[in-house]
């Protein structure tokens, strides 16, 4: 039943994301995102945990995954069905990675 009420979006960033960009991102989360979490690489050998719920978010240092875990960076967002701003989330991740999205400055 919940599957019809909610929609999810996820991505696996291909490289390190800017901590500064992620902090700004958490302060200006697009409307429609109810919950977001993930573990991402923010520098060479540096990992961060990303959390957003309600109207607040945080970024904190995380332990690097053990090689046996083969963990990849990932972000997951949840919103109400039909209201999750997928294009905005994709643009935010691309901007944090320093990638230019067509029609938008990086």
Predicted regions and their residues:
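C-terminal accessory "lid"/substrate-recognition subdomains
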Residues: 1-73, 81-106
């Amino acid at each position: 039943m919940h599957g019809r009420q909610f929609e999810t979006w996820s991505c696996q960033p291909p490289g390190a994301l800017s901590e500064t960009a992620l902090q700004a991102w958490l302060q200006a989360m697009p409307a429609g995102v109810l919950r977001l979490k993930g573990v991402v690489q923010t520098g060479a050998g540096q990992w961060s945990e990303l959390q957003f719920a309600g109207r607040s978010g945080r970024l904190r240092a995380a332990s690097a995954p053990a090689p046996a875990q083969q963990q990849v960076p990932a972000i997951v967002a949840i919103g109400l069905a039909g209201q999750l701003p997928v294009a905005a989330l994709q643009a935010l991740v691309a901007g944090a990675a320093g990638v230019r999205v067509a029609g938008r400055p990086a």
